[in-house]
């Protein structure tokens, strides 16, 4: 037994014991080695092809991330000027009670969750993180006795929640390759219709906030109602906000008018006091708030897309690195088996020559 183990070890490590082996055993061993070499060679070729695909996907995702970032930057002038106008109008109505259907606070019996996921996979845990965040918020709200409806943006989220009967999906949207104002407006119209018709008493957005190429954070943000207060409680004094909710604050602080987490540093100036509005400032505010909401949704879509592309780029980069390591290991294994095959053939030749001369 010890001699047999030593013989096998010598064959695989490229060391031959030069002991003659029976022809039948040597023949079967040769066939097994040849079959093993072909299998390893095929695996190496498969890994190489996979690496080419992951490298290409990484480059495509990197290029798209840059375009997504540029889209956010290009939209800033519009957002900045809109904030300036909103600031000026808010100055006119801040002493008055803003009577807007989008600011109406009522008892929260139904919440609409707008969930932003991707249309495709191969992006690491991006979609899974958003889905888990939504499920946790769903359980939290249902434990309070609140009815929850879903609006799914992105096929992955829609497919996941559609397979589970406890979730009620009222509408689904496709994210698309590049978010547009038309897509954001379509989502905003669905949200407004649900809120104004009192089908939903509160609307929350669940999306991934883009921080950097290697970091993103699933976030819950209250969209409606838009209130001049921080924590949102209904008329019965019941607060249903998430612990990490980012609430839209209709306020002005140091000349700023935006969602607090964005920490906007836009320099705004009050409108000229002599400026005369054709409509009441409250009416203008009612017209501007939906526009501002659409721009917020568009920016959220852009951030979600940038987060998805960054996650895909990192996932494909890790896949490429793993493919390189796997290819390296398979190459070493192939060389060892090839060396063992050559050593075995030499041993057979030497054994045959010794038997013939004997």
From Swiss-Prot:
<dbReference type="Pfam" id="PF00231">
    <property type="entry name" value="ATP-synt"/>
</dbReference>
<keyword id="KW-0813">Transport</keyword>
<feature type="active site">
    <location>
        <position position="123"/>
    </location>
</feature>
<keyword id="KW-0809">Transit peptide</keyword>
<dbReference type="GO" id="GO:0009535">
    <property type="term" value="C:chloroplast thylakoid membrane"/>
</dbReference>
<dbReference type="GO" id="GO:0045259">
    <property type="term" value="C:proton-transporting ATP synthase complex"/>
</dbReference>
<dbReference type="GO" id="GO:0046933">
    <property type="term" value="F:proton-transporting ATP synthase activity, rotational mechanism"/>
</dbReference>
<keyword id="KW-0375">Hydrogen ion transport</keyword>
<comment type="subunit">
    <text>F-type ATPases have 2 components, F(1) - the catalytic core - and F(0) - the membrane proton channel. F(1) has five subunits: alpha(3), beta(3), gamma(1), delta(1), epsilon(1). F(0) has four main subunits: a(1), b(1), b'(1) and c(10-14). The alpha and beta chains form an alternating ring which encloses part of the gamma chain. F(1) is attached to F(0) by a central stalk formed by the gamma and epsilon chains, while a peripheral stalk is formed by the delta, b and b' chains.</text>
</comment>
<keyword id="KW-0934">Plastid</keyword>
<keyword id="KW-0406">Ion transport</keyword>
<keyword id="KW-0793">Thylakoid</keyword>
<dbReference type="InterPro" id="IPR023632">
    <property type="entry name" value="ATP_synth_F1_gsu_CS"/>
</dbReference>
<feature type="transit peptide" description="Chloroplast">
    <location>
        <begin position="1"/>
        <end position="35"/>
    </location>
</feature>
<feature type="disulfide bond">
    <location>
        <begin position="233"/>
        <end position="239"/>
    </location>
</feature>
<keyword id="KW-0139">CF(1)</keyword>
<dbReference type="InterPro" id="IPR035968">
    <property type="entry name" value="ATP_synth_F1_ATPase_gsu"/>
</dbReference>
<comment type="function">
    <text>F(1)F(0) ATP synthase produces ATP from ADP in the presence of a proton or sodium gradient. F-type ATPases consist of two structural domains, F(1) containing the extramembraneous catalytic core and F(0) containing the membrane proton channel, linked together by a central stalk and a peripheral stalk. During catalysis, ATP synthesis in the catalytic domain of F(1) is coupled via a rotary mechanism of the central stalk subunits to proton translocation.</text>
</comment>
<keyword id="KW-1015">Disulfide bond</keyword>
<keyword id="KW-0472">Membrane</keyword>
<comment type="function">
    <text>Produces ATP from ADP in the presence of a proton gradient across the membrane. The gamma chain is believed to be important in regulating ATPase activity and the flow of protons through the CF(0) complex.</text>
</comment>
<protein>
    <recommendedName>
        <fullName>ATP synthase gamma chain, chloroplastic</fullName>
    </recommendedName>
</protein>
<keyword id="KW-0066">ATP synthesis</keyword>
<keyword id="KW-0150">Chloroplast</keyword>
<dbReference type="InterPro" id="IPR000131">
    <property type="entry name" value="ATP_synth_F1_gsu"/>
</dbReference>
<comment type="similarity">
    <text>Belongs to the ATPase gamma chain family.</text>
</comment>
């Amino acid at each position: 037994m010890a001699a047999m183990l030593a013989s096998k070890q010598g064959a695989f490590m490229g060391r031959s014991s030069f002991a003659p082996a029976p022809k039948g055993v040597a023949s079967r061993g040769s066939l097994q080695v040849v079959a093993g070499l072909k299998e390893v060679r095929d695996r190496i070729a498969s890994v190489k092809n996979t690496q080419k695909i992951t490298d290409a996907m990484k480059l495509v995702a990197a290029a798209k991330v840059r375009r997504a970032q540029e889209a956010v930057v290009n939209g800033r002038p519009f957002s900045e000027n809109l904030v300036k106008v909103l600031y000026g109008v808010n100055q006119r109505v801040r002493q008055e009670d803003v009577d807007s259907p989008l600011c109406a606070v009522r008892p929260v019996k139904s919440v609409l969750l707008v969930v932003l996921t991707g249309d495709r996979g191969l992006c690491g845990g991006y979609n899974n993180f958003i889905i888990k965040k939504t499920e946790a918020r769903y359980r939290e709200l249902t434990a309070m006795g609140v009815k929850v409806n879903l609006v799914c943006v992105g096929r992955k989220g829609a497919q996941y929640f559609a397979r589970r009967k406890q979730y009620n999906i009222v509408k689904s949207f496709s994210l698309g390759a590049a978010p547009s104002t038309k897509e954001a407006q379509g989502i905003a119209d669905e949200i407004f219709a649900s809120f104004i018709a009192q089908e939903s008493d509160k609307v929350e957005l669940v999306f991934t906030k883009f921080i950097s190429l290697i970091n993103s954070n699933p976030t819950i943000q209250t969209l409606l109602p838009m209130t001049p207060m921080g924590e949102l409680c209904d008329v019965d004094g019941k607060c249903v906000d998430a612990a990490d909710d980012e609430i839209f604050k209709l306020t002005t602080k140091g000349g700023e008018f935006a969602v607090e987490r964005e920490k906007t540093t836009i320099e705004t100036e009050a409108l000229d006091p002599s400026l005369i509005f054709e409509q009441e400032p409250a009416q203008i505010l009612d017209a501007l708030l939906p526009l501002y909401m659409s721009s917020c949704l568009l920016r959220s879509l852009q951030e979600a897309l940038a987060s998805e592309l960054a996650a895909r780029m990192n996932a494909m980069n890790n896949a490429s690195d793993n493919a390189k390591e796997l290819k390296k290991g398979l190459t070493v294994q192939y060389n060892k088996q090839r060396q063992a095959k050559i050593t075995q053939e030499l041993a057979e030749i030497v054994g045959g020559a010794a038997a013939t001369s004997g």
